[in-house]
Amino acid sequence: MKNTLFCLLAASFAASASLCADAPTVCSAGGKDDMVPGAPPAAQAPATAAPAASRFIYGTPGEEYPPYGELPKELWPFANTEPYYRYFVTRMPFRGPGRDYAPESDLRSLKIGLVDAPKVGPNWERSVRTREGIVLAIEEANIERRPGELPFDLIEHEGIAQWGGAANLAALLADEKVLGYLGTIDGTDAHVALRVTLKTEIVMVNTSDPDQTLTETQIPWLIRVLPDHRQEEGRLAELMVRKCGCTRIAVLRTGDRFARVGAHQFADFARRLGSPVVQELLFSPGATDISYQIAAIKESQPDAIFFLGEPTDIGRFAKQFREAGIKARFFGTDLLMEDGFLKNAGDAAEGTTFTFYSDPDRQDPLWTEFRARFKNRWGHEPDAYAAYAYDGAEILLHAMRIAGPNRWRIRDEVYNLDYYQGVTGWMRFDGTGSNTAPVRIVRYEAGRRVFEPQGEFAPPTTTGKLTSSP
């Protein structure tokens, strides 16, 4: 049935598409045309690491998924009893009209939206790297398009540094007739934009917000390709309590949504494992004097400190903690992979343990080929933001190839995805549309990031599910 539907959709798309000789306009972050290092990949051969069809595995309507991010049962709410009803084990269906709507007669490109971060704060630099991954994916897709297929066009808007601004941008993208969009990094912006997405019915692929409550809204126009807080904080809680034997855990965090949601999730996990957090303190981003926090944490005598905040701040604080004689182990999330932490922490980084998504030095062909193409295009190595943005764009581009210029059918292709093999590895989507692939444990040793040995995640070999082809 799935393959029959694909053939009908592909035939409909081919009949409605017209060849457009004009190159798509791709704007830089901030809306200005951009000259960047390297050349667009016009002469590069497409990746040959794996056939595209084998990288997409789809589910079936009404299918049940393991609850709560596929975490160990001891971390579930109501783990010791069977509740009357468990939410988030099936995907919310879309029962509205639209799948049979005809495309516009004057369609000259397939538009993809992107909501950047505002040009303030550290998220701007992450947004630039996100954009680089998306632009590369679109450039490659335009090179590989077949005769009669429309080009892809990136419609981009800089974020607004005001609460609620993302709603206006999501509405603007709808007015500009995008078929799907990517973004945003900030969790508050993502939540606000998603509410508009429910009304405009344009699928959103989030590539960088780990807030687990984003997909728990059960709005069936969203998937997230980045593993969420449950994967990171759940893994860290198990590591601290079960493997390291920590019984007195303190938390030092910022007051933003990223840290607030992450700390709440971690505290829940630690409590369920029998080691409630003994202290939770806040700091202001950019602060240099945290003498109050140091004194309070020192008095609580923790054997572990979990940091949530910007890596430059955490690096500076780690150094101050060691100078104050605090010997507790340091733990953190993926942000500690950034160079700012090691630069500010110096020797105090030794032994700091954190979670990350995959080893950048692994030899997976999809990753190594992407890494080379990205460096050739942009002049530097890709980070996690660029890689997940590339994967998110690839999922959306694939759906648009299959479904054609119909955003309701594009939604079906995106939202029904169970497994996807991207440059970041295999993804596994749960009943809310969130990637639940396991994360890695990393430790700083002698100034180097050392990844704990762990097998690469892959889907079961006999899923019995269908794949589609581009």
Residue ranges and their predicted role:
Residues 1-4:
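Positively charged n-region of N-terminal signal peptides that target proteins for export
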Residues 6-10, 17-470:
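Extracytosolic ligand-binding ectodomains
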